[in-house]
Amino acid sequence: MSEDTPLVVAMDGPSGTGKSSVSRRLATRLGARYLDTGAMYRVATLRVLRAGVELTDPAAIAAAVKELPLTIGTDPSREVIELDGEDVSAEIRGDAVTKAVSAVSAVPEVRDLLVAAQRDIAADARRIVVEGRDIGTVVLPAADAKIYLTASAEARAERRNQQNIREGRGDDYAAVLADVQRRDTLDSTRAVSPLRPAADAVLVDTSELTMDEVIDELSRVVAQQISTGSAQ
């Protein structure tokens, strides 16, 4: 597949499957841009938290993000995530945002705002890997390739706990597992854009695969979907 050929890859799945890491590497291999839509929801959540808005007040949440000065880069080799010109790439990964992001993401006005932005970014990129939770079903249903990454809750919790340890946030596997299960329930049962694979997505279980094995499998899946036109 030539790097001159337009390409949109939709990468969906729950948290902890390695979506961000593998999507960046896949984008690099494909000569494509990369968009982390989850980071956009995290920036919106940070905005809400800084405004002191109650997470039980959808109208106030919508008002807080109506004017969202968000900058997000699409170069897979470097992360650029800014809120009103401030680098918030580390802060949006903190516990406060992680615990609140599902509630903010469930507000229809928030999703409408960010989905429109995501579509604009994808349209401006000739080749792009877009990762999130509703890319193949809602954001880019006509994507050239659709992949749904999955892994057991235990495997995902172990990965996140190891990341927390590496980044100095402590070792608490039980708490991380409980949070993974909580977010799975919230994301799969929300009224707006519930987490589910697109009907034409290829499911890839990363539980027992190394990073290199995942990238190889995803490259194969993308090539196969492009050749057969199955993700349409």
Curated annotation (Swiss-Prot):
Signal peptide (residue range): none
Name the UniProt record assigns to this protein: Cytidylate kinase
GO process annotations (BP): nucleobase-containing small molecule interconversion; pyrimidine nucleotide metabolic process
Protein EC: 2.7.4.25
PANTHER family per the UniProt record, alphabetical: CYTIDYLATE KINASE, CYTIDYLATE KINASE/PANTOATE-BETA-ALANINE LIGASE
Renumbered residue ranges of the record's region Disordered: 1-21
Keyword annotations: ATP-binding, Cytoplasm, Kinase, Nucleotide-binding, Transferase
GO terms for MF: ATP binding; CMP kinase activity; dCMP kinase activity
Keyword Kinase in record: yes
Location(s), subcellular: Cytoplasm
Cross-referenced InterPro entries: Cytidylate_kin, Cytidylate_kinase_dom, P-loop_NTPase
KW Kinase (keyword) present: yes
Group of enzyme by EC: transferase
Residues involved in ATP binding: 13-21
Chemical reaction(s) catalysed: CMP + ATP = CDP + ADP; dCMP + ATP = dCDP + ADP
Alphabetical list of Pfam families matching this protein: Cytidylate_kin
Family annotation (NCBIfam families): cmk
Main localization of the protein described in the UniProt heading: cytoplasm
Family according to the record: Belongs to the cytidylate kinase family. Type 1 subfamily.
GO cellular component labels: cytosol
